[in-house]
Amino acid sequence: MKNLVSVIIPVYNASKTIEKTIKSVLCQSYTYFEIIIIDDWSTDNSFKIIEELSKSDSRIIIYRNQKNLGVAKTRNVGINIAKGEFISFLDSDDIWKCSKLEKQLEYIKQKNADICYTSYEMINNNETNSVLRVAPKEINYNGLLKENVICCSTAVAKTSLLKKYPFQTEFFHEDFVMWLKLLKHEYKAVGIQESLVIYRKGGRSSDKLKACRNRWIVYRKSEKLSLILSIYYLINYTLNGVKKYYFC
C-alpha cells in the first residue's frame, strides 16, 4: 500500500520494555502505519502484554511463532506479512521519538533514497549514561564494510527491496549482511543526523572477541573478500569499535 509503513517488532522475553516500545510507535506524528509484532515464543508474559495492547489500536497486528526461531527468521516473518510501501524495524527494547517516521519519509522523498537511517542515543538498562551516535549523511558499500552505521531500529527501507533481499539466517550479524547486500547493488542509503531513536545497549555485543570472529565470517563467507581486504576491513572495524566504546 502506497505510503503505508509496516513497523516490524520481533519480541522475545521483553516484558519489561515492550509496552514502552510499542507506545513510542503509537505516538508517531505520521499515523499511516501498521505495527507487526511477532512474538518468538517468549517464556515470560510478553505475549499477554502485546495482546492487551492490540485491543486498543487496530493498527497492531500480532503473530506468534510456533517455536523459537531467532531474530533473523522472526524479522523475515514480519517482512512476508508487511503490506506497506516501506518497512521500519524496531527492537523490543528500543524507543522511537515521536517525529521519527515523518522526518524519515520526507527525507527519503527529498533525497530520492531507498534506505534512511538516523543518529541515535545509546543507553544502558538503567536508562543512564546516554551516548550519542551520529549518523553519516550517506553511506556506500565500502564505507559500511568499515563500520556498520545503520542501527536497525533507526532504519526505514522500501519493502520491495527487503522482500527481495531478506535477512540471511546463517550469519550472526544478519542486519549488517542485509544492508551490505542492498548497498552492493547500489541502492541509496542516506542518514539523518538528528537523533530519533533511543537504543538500549543491554547485553548485546558484549563479547568483543566473538563479534570480531563473526565479522570476519561475514567478510570471508558472505562478501567473499580476499584475505588482505578482510584484514583491512577488520582492522577498521576494530579501531572504530575501540573509539566507539572507550573514547565516547
Predicted regions and their residues:
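Glycine-rich, basic loop-to-helix element that forms the pyrophosphate-binding segment
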Residues: 65-82, 103
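Short aromatic/hydrophobic "clamp" motif used to bind/position activated sugar donors
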Residues: 87
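Short, well-formed alpha-helical segments that are part of the catalytic scaffolds
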Residues: 13-27
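Acidic helix N-cap motif at the loop->helix transition within catalytic regions
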Residues: 16-19, 44-53, 95, 99
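Conserved nucleotide-sugar donor-binding catalytic segment
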Residues: 80, 136-211, 218
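A conserved acidic beta->alpha catalytic loop
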Residues: 39-48, 67, 91
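Cell-envelope/extracellular polymer assembly enzymes that use nucleotide-activated donors
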Residues: 3-6, 24, 34, 177
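Conserved donor NDP-sugar-binding/catalytic core segment of glycosyltransferases
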Residues: 99-130
